[in-house]
Amino acid sequence: MSRRGTTEKQIEKPDPIYRNRLVNLLVNRILRNGKKSLAYRILYGAMRNIRRATKKNPLSVLRQAVRRVTPNVTVKARRVGGSTYQVPIEIESSQGKALAIRWLLVASKKRPGRNMAFKLSYELIDAARDNGNAVRKREETHRMAEANRAFAHFR
């Protein structure tokens, strides 16, 4: 067993324009091949589209979208006596937020549209209104956890 202590969780830095940690989390998930300026351009373009389409503060739309997509429980495969069970597990808010961001990005990549900023903005707007593929994914996960509640004692 390791004698090394556990490291403290690093606090995410806020982004330069909105000064928000959630925006920076989203940028870091969009990031590919170290092109952070491109990731910022995509997200800020999406924020402009949100402001144009909804006439609301894009940061509040983003927060509401992430809140609506964040799951409370998830299922984890657990092997017991030769068979695999999907065991429902409650997850903490940081893990739920990470899942929500991942689902939002996957759903927006699957959308038809001109570019990623456009697709992301409309996925965020839909999620804030409680519909869209990311919200469907959360509901599906909750249904799966509810269906497998009988296996919760395997935790």
Curated annotation (Swiss-Prot):
One of its GO terms (molecular function) is rRNA binding. GO terms for cellular component: chloroplast; small ribosomal subunit. CDD domains: uS7_Chloroplast. Keywords: Chloroplast, Plastid, Ribonucleoprotein, Ribosomal protein, RNA-binding, rRNA-binding. It holds the Pfam family Ribosomal_S7. InterPro entries: Ribosomal_uS7, Ribosomal_uS7_bac/org-type, Ribosomal_uS7_CS, Ribosomal_uS7_dom, Ribosomal_uS7_dom_sf. Gene3D superfamilies: Ribosomal protein S7 domain. The keyword Plastid applies. One of its GO terms (biological process) is translation. It is found in: Plastid, Chloroplast. SUPFAM superfamilies: Ribosomal protein S7. Part of the 30S ribosomal subunit. Belongs to the universal ribosomal protein uS7 family. One of the primary rRNA binding proteins, it binds directly to 16S rRNA where it nucleates assembly of the head domain of the 30S subunit. This is Small ribosomal subunit protein uS7cz/uS7cy.
